[in-house]
């Protein structure tokens, strides 16, 4: 296949910087991402951000079927060339973030994995779309900005620990499985990236995840405020009653959200929701 840069130029493609378009061209890196995702010939894969189709092709070489979602229709002539000859790839020019679960399931089915080089500006929203909503993949492998990846896997009481860390932990286990230098992209972005894999499973069966997510967002609503004050501002429970609940769980009344574990937040959510 011709060089991606030449294909883009010959098709008159102009990068839309508002969409965070940075494409991977190194075949070894592309194959490594697919390997780390654990995709095999039995898997249906959803890719977000087809881009120039380089990762799409690498996934298609291993997967049973690839549904790749792209919002920039200007890439169609590029993809007609880069994905030619592949009969197990379907490019869908739609925004996954705006699609209802029913519409998505009708296209991709209910058993799938997500593999993507995600545009940085939608990273958190996209990951949570596949965790919080009713369509759950068995695994999510994404290339994200390094500092975002660090937040995904952070430990309690660290600078990077936050609502997204807890929210991901509610649905599965995240780990950084690779690092990618910014020079591996075209055009070259300003920051390095990390490859994160989230293995999704019913980690907290029986837990009301909607209520727990409310408590998580509340705990980190204003990081400089104490957990007690944040909870009091959101839940219809008197401050002294909330304080008693925290004390019953051996949580310091001056504690902030970033010092708590997910298990503690689940306990708080359960008691405040009664």
Per-region residue spans from a language model:
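Catalytic cores of RNA-modifying enzymes
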Residues: 1-218, 258, 274
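Peripheral terminal appendages
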Residues: 3, 38-44, 54-55, 235, ...
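Hydrophobic "lid"/C-terminal helical patch
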Residues: 33, 231, 269
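An accessory alpha-helical subdomain
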Residues: 194, 198-200, 205-244, 249-252, ...
């Amino acid at each position: 296949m011709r060089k991606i840069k030449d294909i883009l130029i010959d098709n008159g493609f102009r990068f839309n910087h508002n969409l965070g378009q940075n494409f991977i061209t190194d075949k070894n890196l592309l194959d490594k991402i697919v390997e780390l995702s654990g995709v095999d010939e039995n898997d249906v894969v959803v890719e977000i951000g087809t881009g120039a189709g380089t990762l799409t092709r690498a996934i298609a070489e291993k997967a049973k079927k690839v549904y790749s979602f792209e919002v920039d229709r200007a890439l169609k002539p590029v993809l007609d060339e880069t994905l030619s000859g592949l009969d197990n790839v379907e490019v869908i020019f739609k925004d996954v973030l705006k699609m209802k679960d029913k519409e998505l399931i009708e296209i991709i089915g209910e058993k799938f994995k997500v593999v993507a080089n995600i545009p940085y500006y939608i990273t958190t929203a996209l990951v949570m779309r596949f965790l919080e909503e009713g369509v759950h993949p068995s695994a999510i492998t994404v290339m994200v900005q390094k500092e975002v990846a660090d937040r995904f896997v952070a430990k309690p009481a660290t600078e990077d620990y936050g609502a997204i860390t807890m929210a991901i932990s509610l649905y599965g286990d995240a780990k950084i499985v690779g690092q990618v230098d910014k020079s591996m992209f075209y055009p070259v972005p300003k920051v390095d990236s990390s490859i994160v894999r989230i293995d999704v499973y019913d980690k907290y069966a029986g837990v009301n995840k909607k209520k727990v997510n409310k408590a998580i967002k509340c705990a980190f609503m204003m990081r400089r405020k104490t957990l007690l004050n944040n909870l009091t501002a959101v839940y219809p429970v008197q401050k002294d009653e909330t304080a008693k609940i925290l004390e019953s769980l051996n949580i310091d009344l001056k504690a902030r959200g970033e010092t708590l574990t997910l298990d503690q937040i689940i306990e708080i959510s359960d008691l405040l929701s009664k």
